[in-house]
From Swiss-Prot:
Gene deletion effect: Plants are late-flowering. Increased alternative splicing of several genes, including APRR9.
Annotated source species: Arabidopsis thaliana (Mouse-ear cress)
SAM-dependent MTase PRMT-type domain mapped to chain residues: 314-620
Protein name as annotated: Protein arginine N-methyltransferase 1.5
GO molecular function: protein methyltransferase activity; protein-arginine omega-N asymmetric methyltransferase activity
Length: 642
């Protein structure tokens, strides 16, 4: 059964724990002992007798030899094979061996075992760790196999830290880091989404930053050795704080745990007292501890539960000028009370600065909400006036005729007819009867300016008095390089250029943030310069931490931070993000070809904001350590319409 219930999680979000076993001719007993008695969810078991070698069979001169598998497909039901067995490909295979017989035997065996696993309808098979300095032939053969697979997933076994006796660690610099081994193999297999990684977790762990890289990779399982466990005061197995944090991170990223190795904590009685004569699984105590770790993880918050379905799901950004928003979209944004509390605070400060206390009963402040939607900013502004005891006259300007209907009903229902004037018009083309003291808008996108706030406010600021206040007063975009294997494969699945040249709004989850974010473009309002130019260009350099090891950059995460007024800010940039706000997910700019980056070589990236007569678009490229093609030239794939 699954590891247990966790607060706020759906049943489909449960995690599972398997156990690695030796080869057995009696698969039924293997499942009974490890699943029915042991409590594990599945076995990671060899499918073929490890003594089998095709060349030895051929040498006997027998034409039709039966593959010495662990059991007929009939000994288990199809659902049992699929749900409770992960195939373990023979660990002796070495497709890059200089011994030609061994190499040929390895290739034949690999293909035979994968074919048998496919026949059994297994969900996954574990590939053994590459043994030499090169894995080119191994990867070539696996890539051939991947082309013919439909549902079977292949997990490549990779150690988190290589042991001293590991045959990989010859003098090859590229293999000093086990991530390099995985990256080399994955590149040779063309980033196939059916190829994932299973990490061997031993007693020694690399640095935190080195571990962090794996959170952006397609890790399907953590194979946890019994040697990694410590012993607590009562003699039971436990893990170090770092190991606990790592396993919790894998759980949070939907990876499974597999227990492997011999029991090193001899606490079990040979027979299960609850079932007389039944041998108890000696690895059960490790399963119990893993289940304990899962169940003690913090419950998901209400916001996290809502966002679960959006994790790593690519969405097209809004086109607010070209398209009118639907009621459901308005409803989602309006539920974000934190955002409107910040806007109310900003308006309160602006009103107090605009009108001194002694004139509060005399002066009426003219406030214009441009892009009023269904009225949340109108409400926040009127509440600010009430809190500060200031008189207010509001113009609510909205181009969406459907939202205007809701606005009229809101004004009538709240009795605001004498205070609020509704203007059904595009703010860029409206002629205001008077100038405003305060101009309020919520036109920001995930990247700040990506929903054309600069262009809209440039057109609207003619309403503003020379000493008027714009809320927001400024906003800045930020980017940071990320490893995002899932996002890259989702874009790649479209098999065209356009999707690699499109920016996506996405709730980032299975990503590794490789360096701190840096600012890109800043816009300030009001902007009374005689020649307004909203085109921008920025060159940035990012460096990986020295202890991180190399990493693969699949693209860039984008954020924004805005100053609403003075010290009131709003944003999603990770280090300054407004807590508990959900109106914006980050934006993702993919790279057509991922770039491998090393700690001693900076990543140099270029970003452009380009403006035409009818659209605005971004272009981006990498110039170091290896140049990438220019992305989205002339806005050929992705643009925002004016």
């Amino acid at each position: 059964m699954p590891l247990g219930e966790r607060g706020g999680w759906e049943r489909t979000e449960s995690r599972y724990c398997g156990v690695e076993t030796d080869f057995s001719n009696d698969v039924t007993h293997l499942l009974n002992f490890n699943i029915s008695t042991g409590g594990f969810d599945y076995v990671l078991a060899p499918l073929v007798d490890p003594s089998y070698r095709p060349s030895l069979v051929e040498g006997n001169g027998v034409d039709t030899q039966v593959l010495p598998v662990c059991g007929s497909d009939l000994v288990l039901s199809p659902s049992q094979w699929s749900s409770h067995v992960v195939g373990k490909i023979s660990s002796w295979i070495d497709l890059d061996s200089e011994d030609e017989v061994l190499r040929m035997d390895s290739e034949t065996t690999l293909k035979q075992e994968i074919a048998w696993a496919t026949h059994l309808s297994l969900q996954a098979c574990l590939l053994p760790t590459p043994k030499g300095k090169s894995c080119a032939n191994y990867a070539r053969c696996v890539n051939q196999i991947l082309q013919g697979l439909t549902t079977l997933q292949l997990w490549l076994r990779v150690p988190l830290v290589k042991s001293e006796g590991d045959s990989m660690d010859d003098t090859s610099e590229g293999l000093n880091d086990s991530w390099e081994l995985w990256n080399s193999f994955r590149l040779l297999c063309e980033h196939d989404s059916k190829l994932s990684v299973a990490l061997d977790v031993l007693s020694t762990l690399p640095s935190e930053t080195s571990l962090g890289r794996w959170m952006g990779e397609s890790v399907r399982a953590a194979i946890l050795s019994t040697d990694a466990f410590l012993t607590n005061a009562r003699g039971y197995p436990c893990l170090s704080k770092r190991h606990q944090k790592l396993i919790a991170g894998f759980f949070d990223h939907a990876a499974q745990v597999v227990i492997c190795g011999k029991p090193v904590h001899n606490l079990q009685k040979p027979l299960d007292s609850s079932s007389e004569g039944t041998e108890k699984n000696p690895l059960r105590i490790y399963l119990d501890y893993v289940a304990y770790l899962f169940q003690k993880m913090e419950s998901l918050s209400e916001q996290e539960r809502i966002e679960l379905g959006y994790r790593d799901f690519l969405q097209a950004p809004l086109q607010p000028l070209m398209d009118n928003l639907e009621a459901q979209t308005y409803e989602t944004f309006e539920r974000d009370s934190v955002k409107y509390i910040q806007y109310q605070r900003a308006v309160e400060k602006a009103l107090v600065d605009r009108v001194p206390d002694e004139k509060a009963s005399e002066l009426t402040t003219v406030l214009m909400v441009v892009g009023a939607g269904r009225g949340p900013l109108v409400r926040a502004s009127l509440q600010a006036a009430e809190e500060t005891d200031r008189k207010l006259k509001v113009y609510a300007v909205e181009k969406n005729p459907n939202a205007v209907v809701t606005l009229h009903n809101l004004v009538k229902m709240e009795g605001w007819e004498d205070v609020v004037t509704i203007i059904s018009c595009d703010m860029r083309f409206w002629n205001a009867p008077e100038q405003a003291d305060i101009l309020v808008s919520e036109l920001l996108g995930s990247f700040g300016d990506n929903e054309l706030s600069p262009e809209c406010l440039d057109g609207a600021q003619r309403f503003l008095k020379p000493d008027g206040i714009s809320i927001p007063s400024s906003y800045t975009s930020f980017i940071q390089p990320i490893t995002a294997s899932k996002l890259y494969n989702d874009v790649k699945a479209h098999k065209d250029l356009a999707h690699f040249e499109t920016a996506y709004v996405v709730k980032l989850h299975s990503v590794a943030k490789l360096a701190p974010s840096q600012s890109v473009f800043t816009f300030t309002h009001p902007n009374f310069s005689t020649k307004v130019n909203n085109q921008r260009y920025k060159k940035l350099q990012f460096s990986l931490p020295s202890d991180a090891g190399s990493a693969l950059v699949h693209g860039f995460a984008g954020y924004f931070d805005s100053v609403l007024y003075k010290d009131v800010h709003l944003g999603i940039e990770p280090t300054t993000a407004t807590p508990n706000m959900f109106s914006w997910f980050p934006i993702f700019f993919p790279l057509r070809k991922p770039v491998e980056v090393h700690p001693d070589t900076p990543l140099e990236v270029h970003f452009w904001r380009c403006c035409g007569s009818s659209k605005v678009w971004y272009e981006w490229s990498v110039s170091s350590p290896t140049p990438s093609p220019m992305h989205n030239t002339n806005g050929r794939s992705y643009w925002v319409g004016l």
